[in-house]
Amino acid sequence: MLISLSSSTLLTLFFIALSASWLSGLLFLHARMPLRFVHIHIGIAALPSLVSLLALVNNNGDRVVGPWHLDTLAWLMAFFVLTIGLIIQRFSVRYLMGDRSYRKYFALFTFTTGVSSVAWLSDDLRFMIMCWGATLIGLVLLIGLNKGWKVVSEATKISGYLFTISWIALLSAIIWLFQITGQWQLTSVVTNENVAQFGTLEKTGINLLIIVAVMIPAAQWPFQRWLIESAVAPTPVSAIMHAGLVNAGGIMLTRFSPLFHDDIAQIILLIFSSISVLIGTGISLVQVDYKRQLVGSTIAQMGFMLIQCALGAYLAAVIHLILHGLFKATLFLQAGSSVQRVEVVKQSNKKMSNLWMIVGRVLGLFIAIAFWFITSGEGYQLVSALILGWSLYFSWKQLVVFGEGRMGRIAGLIVLIGFSLIYFTVHNSLYKWLHTDMYQSVQPSAPAVIFVICILLFSSVICTFVTRNQSSTLSAVLYLWSVRVGEARRKSVESHPSYLKHDVSKGGNS
């Protein structure tokens, strides 16, 4: 049985562990420190993650301790970001070996994930803006560590430029909030009494600034360029970027959620996020580069997460960003497994495949209808039901319909059932854990729900048409447009890394 500790004690232990990990990272930067010290550093870096887990398990409810807001969401996000960072650092021990910036990567990984976790523990908006700014700076430094490569320099410039705009937008929103409420504490700013003081234009203006601050790190249209060009960063950097940092918008919007209720800013966020979902999906479908496929996937997934926020489903958005982070980190760290020998897929009995396809459609429709009746019947649940039914049908098609022979279909069915059970178990556990009054879903307006459903149906119709008419003019136009949107600028692309010539001429990396 775990020893029950007070919130202030856990907070003190957390900052001691975090300071120790930062000190370890600084020590590793010293040239005289042997490279094998990295293993000790990984052990020390695990301490704040363990303390945040202990705090999460011992959480005694919503507590405000000085400038810190210690609720379940805060400790969960601290644990999530630090654990993702720890796993990626462990992966990088051998992956980045030989890189001239080897030591700097670990120091920056530790610093960036550390200040990011502190940002979500902050109740004081001044601490939050400082920590979030430090997180963005750390991310830019990670992207630009390979200074000898011109392409990386270009990616660093555009990332730094857009992140500066994002940070200034959030800073402006926070200062505006202080001028109206006279409060720096977030929990005091978003009370019903203070929110009622806001005029319509003031509320919309603040919300639009927060939306801009959120959309840029989430790589939403028209700010997706930085994420596309950052694909030149090493795989561990991309992993921490996609899994633990770009999804911060969901947490930020959740913290400021009372401000967005019944405001036109929700519709604006919904429109831009829906466009981003379409663009990201198109990029992931047409790109042949594995990392750019994942970039497109992240743009689409972050768009859907922001759609959830726009519909008032903040709890669903938080669960989405956690599951997406775990999934995307796994995909990046397992990127090498995508290089497989080409196999000729044998066509099975066409009639049998069509029969299994029909079964999948009926099953997906049945699950969607059942989910709709079982849930509370809120507007967002209808969207969830449609997505759940489509996801089940798509998974059935890939794992069962395209399975080779009877054993292949049986294996696919077992995998589908197993992962479905795991997903629902994790989803329900997180839902019960995070289900507090502050993060209750707000009933979305009927036009917003109808708009999202129309976007989903439109996307489905377009995909079906393109699949069945690949030689049509519309298919060619959509393909070329998706390729163009998903490509980096010409000066941000090289057919071969030019900096390698310098390394080869010196006999390798030193």
Swiss-Prot record:
- Transmembrane keyword on record: yes
Write down any Gene Ontology CC term: plasma membrane
Task: Please give one Gene Ontology molecular function term for this protein.
Answer: NADH dehydrogenase (ubiquinone) activity
Per the UniProt record, one Pfam family is: Proton_antipo_M
UniProt membrane topology term = Multi-pass membrane protein
Q: Name one GO biological process term.
A: electron transport coupled proton transport
Localization in the cell = Cell membrane
Listed A to Z, the keywords are:
Cell membrane, Membrane, Transmembrane, Transmembrane helix, Transport
- Any transmembrane segments, and where? 9-29, 37-57, 68-88, 105-122, 125-145, 158-178, 204-224, 226-246, 266-286, 303-323, 355-375, 382-402, 410-430, 446-466
According to its UniProt record, which protein family does this protein belong to?
Answer: Belongs to the inorganic carbon transporter (TC 9.A.2) DabB family.
Q: How does it assemble?
A: Forms a complex with DabA.
Sum up the protein's function in the record's words: Part of an energy-coupled inorganic carbon pump. Expression of both dabA and dabB (DA2) restores growth in ambient air to E.coli deleted of its carbonic anhydrase genes (called CAfree, deletion of 'can' and 'cynT').
Instruction: Indicate what this protein is called per its UniProt record.
Output: Probable inorganic carbon transporter subunit DabB
Q: Which organism is it from?
A: Bacillus anthracis
Q: Which gene encodes it?
A: dabB
